[in-house]
Each structure stands twice: as C-alpha cells, then as structure tokens.
A protein has these predicted regions:
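Terminal-region recognition feature
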Residues: 1-116
Length: 116
C-alpha cells in the first residue's frame, strides 16, 4: 500500500485507503504526536460520548486542546464509539473543551474522521 500511495491514485484507491482498517486513527495520532495527553470525559450534563476524544495535550512543546473523532479497530470498538459518529453529548463535550481552550488561551487541534 505504501508504494501505491507514492503514485497517482485513482478515486477508488482513495476510497479504499480512507476505509482501510489499519489506517491511523485519533489514538495513533495522540500516541505519535503528543508528549503528554490528559483526556477529559463528559459533557457536564448527561454523559460521555466515547466517539469523541478530547483533552489537554503537549505537541512540540506547545500546550493545546486536542479534539478528535474516535473510531475503533474492530466491531466491538466501533460499536462502543458509535462508528465515530458524535452524539449530542459529544458535541457538548467538544464545546466544553473549546471553551476551556478559550479560557486558557490555548490553540485547538482537531482531527475530523467521520463516516460518509
């Protein structure tokens, strides 16, 4: 697959890469990019959306708020994360994180990985 990505890809090749089970997800990016990450849970109203990860992180020495859609690697993880589709709790959680970023003057880094 890596060799093929170095050449011109057809539209169908791009779709296949986007759907590939082993492509990086938010957890991979957090592990590879962040020196540290403190995940925050819940929307402070109803509950926590497992389809959205967010929290405080350090990337390249810079403190940031990180928000991203979470997809699982298998069926069970996908069901737990609602296949990466945010619920109302997830949108409230994202708003909570963005308000915290504004309050503390931190940049927001977002990873959008939604189905469809």
């Amino acid at each position: 697959m890596a060799k093929k990505t170095q050449t011109k890809l057809s539209p169908w090749d791009i779709v296949q890469i986007a759907r590939h089970a082993e492509r990086p997800n938010i957890a991979d990016y957090i592990r590879l990019l962040c020196e540290d990450f403190v995940e925050l849970h819940g929307d402070r109203l109803f509950g926590d959306d497992r389809g959205l990860i967010g929290g405080f992180a350090t990337i390249g020495g810079e403190k940031v708020v990180l928000i991203g859609h979470r997809k699982g690697r298998g069926v069970e993880e996908n069901i737990e994360a609602n296949f990466g589709m945010a619920s109302p709790e997830g949108y409230r959680k994202a708003m909570r994180l963005m308000r915290l970023a504004e309050k503390y003057g931190l940049p927001v880094v977002s990873f959008v990985d939604t189905p469809g």
